[in-house]
Amino acid sequence: MRQSNMFRHAYVAWPLFNYTDYEGELCDSGVTDTHTTPKISELKTLLTPRFIHFDEWQVFQAYVNLQKTSSNPFYSFAFDALEQYKTQNSNSKIQVLINQVDRGDGRPSFHKIDINDNRSSRNNKRELKIAIANLKIPVEDIERAFRKDREPNVSYERQQTLWKILNEAELQGVELLVLPEVSVPVSWLPFMISHARRHQIALIFGLEHWVCGNKAYNLLVEAFPFRTTGQYKSCLVNMRVKNHYAPEEKRTLEKFRLLPAEPQTDNYFYNLVNWNGIQLSSYNCFELANIEHRSLFKSELDLLIACVWNRDTSYYAHILQSATRDLFCYVVQSNTSQYGGSCVLKPSRTIESEIIKVKGGDNGCILTTKLDISGLRDSQHKSTRGPEDSAFKATPPGYDHERVLKR
């Protein structure tokens, strides 16, 4: 039965492992610790009893890239998965463009990703309903994820909390849900991506440290749903390694003889995504402290997203207030609830700039709001501000107003 692939593929813990030469337990989510690099069987994909989703191919390729010891950077999995999927599925209608931009001036490279959903016109996306998760991430759970003498916390109680947040987001009609850094166990990654595709909700969250050998990978995950030919559900998955590990994070990893997997200076990398006509980029906690990195997409953004686990909320509050005005875009941050600072900001008068700000609580929940994208872009395109433009402040000096037309 295993050789024929004629069984319920939903039981397979990691996507497409049943299409490879892997001989271990397919239902074991601990496959991430095997240090194996399985290869997809062309015969099995040719004779597959079901449709293989694009996001399954991406998650599988991300796993393979983490296990490889080649010089190719981890983020190359996104382009590799796209090209391989198109090769294996000649009839694929995946309308995703990924272009790598290397500025060559010492600044980070980035992927410019364009997701073309035939259901919507780029010019008619007037607002976006988002939610931030107010969720407690104990430090004990973070350490359990990478300590060899502990097991990750994948308890029923933790699962119920996350499920409740996802279900509430669906009930509220949320289009984009943001969760904190290191908020999701590695073994739950396939479920999260599948949920994004099936329910057509974008998810941005931090994955717990993924340990390969003696390296601990702090990964920021983005899942952007779309429909091929306007009707078939699909999903684009982005994952990248944190560019700047926090000093305390490094010290904690070193206590357990682990190395941070942060890239070298010439391999710093980000993503600039155009999804449903909205242009955004995501940052992973301490990356925001780098003034050059957070200004990388000046005049390019409708929305900047930050997934953090951070005690110094005052420091980050100043960074975010600066970012929303300097970049002249909405800023969304999700932090662990015991420290607070989770917020949604817009570039307006101080008294109006905080759309959402929350801290505390024992129960996990979400807070929602709608972002006025058309109003923001209208202000971004104006060189001066008139008395009728009270919803937003004037754009900062040096802002490229013409760039708005190219999104």
Across the structure, where does each feature detected by a protein language model lie?
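C-terminal functional modules of predominantly eukaryotic multidomain proteins
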Residues: S390-R407
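Short catalytic-loop micro-motif centered on adjacent basic/acidic residues
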Residues: L176-E181, L280-Y283, L304-A306, V332
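Active-site-proximal beta-strand elements of phosphoester/diester hydrolases
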Residues: E127-E151, M239-V241, I278-E287, I305-C307
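Extended repeat-based interaction scaffolds and adjacent low-complexity, acidic/S/T/P-biased segments
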Residues: M1-S121, L128
